[in-house]
């Protein structure tokens, strides 16, 4: 089994990535392979609504010059998906929005290849907005009929400066429990 996480923060090794790594640690303890893909510092455009993916059904977006098709294939091949985003103006970052729009559209055009995969949201926030960010990611998982594991609270950390997550004991516990629950759900759904 393999989980691929997409870090939507432009900050490499920032709080969002550190939260993902906490989840990864628990997944690895359960023998689940992990891979981190940094998308937050990339320039992706959103879906343009051309419906070419519905015509071609070739598992690709017609926009082929920005690396999103490689990301879509990573999502298709993974058993579990983590999408991490800091809160930007009360919601997900632009690269995460583009991933959601384009992967979701290509998946649905190709028999919904995301169906029944396990999906988890990871968010980092300074003060407010994490519920919208968390919900935006989970709405994506829900509309694609994915299985969403829970934790002991919403999957968020209160943090601003890089490394602040290390001071957020409750947030770290949430991500530890998310990793344990994600591993359990994946094993149960793949029996």
Regions flagged by a language model, labelled:
Residues 1, 8, 24, 29-30, ...:
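Glycine-rich phosphate/pyrophosphate-binding loop and the adjoining helix
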Residues 2-9, 120-123:
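Short beta-strand segments enriched in small/hydrophobic residues
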Residues 5-19, 23:
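N-terminal cysteine/histidine-rich coordination modules
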Residues 10-11, 41, 126:
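Short, glycine/serine-rich, charged loops/turns that create anion-binding
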Residues 17-21, 134, 172:
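Short amphipathic alpha-helical segment that frequently serves as the phosphate-/nucleotide-binding helix
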Residues 32-42:
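A short beta-strand-loop structural module common to alpha/beta enzyme folds
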Residues 42-75:
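Cysteine-cluster motifs in flexible loop/terminal segments that predominantly coordinate metals
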Residues 62-147, 153:
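Helix-loop-strand module that forms the ligand-binding subsite of alpha/beta enzymes
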